[in-house]
Amino acid sequence: MLRIWKATERQRLVPVEMETAFPFLLEPDHVVSLLGGGGKTTLLYEMAGFGVRNGQNVLVTTSTHLYRPPEEWRDRTLKEVERKFQAGCAAIIGSDCRDPKKIAMPEEQLFETARKKAVSYTHLTLPT
């Protein structure tokens, strides 16, 4: 489990829950971009898991490169993406690239269609 820390007024770090740190994750239809140094992939998958546990359809992809997920997690076709959404799982799409440890931006047609499916397959309305 990922621990998110927030500095208090006294400069002490205290743990913060995912829904407190990122309340928009409980709302549908958001695009999240992660920038910066280390920890992006870990945070990305934690956010994806949080979204799935809260009834969201989650599509994970990249506009540049992303560490390659285990092969069984990766979705290469729209049918695979649909199966993941129907099963209540996150879908991960991306293209192969020169670096065997990473995936690259997916083909545009797969991305656009998968993005639309993510919105249309919303299967749970969250309480407010």
List where the protein language model places each region:
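Conserved mixed alpha/beta catalytic, RNA-binding, or beta-rich assembly cores of soluble enzyme
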Residues: I103-F111, L124
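Core catalytic machinery and nucleic-acid-binding channels of phosphodiester-processing enzymes
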Residues: L2-K6, F24-L25, L35, V52-N57, ...
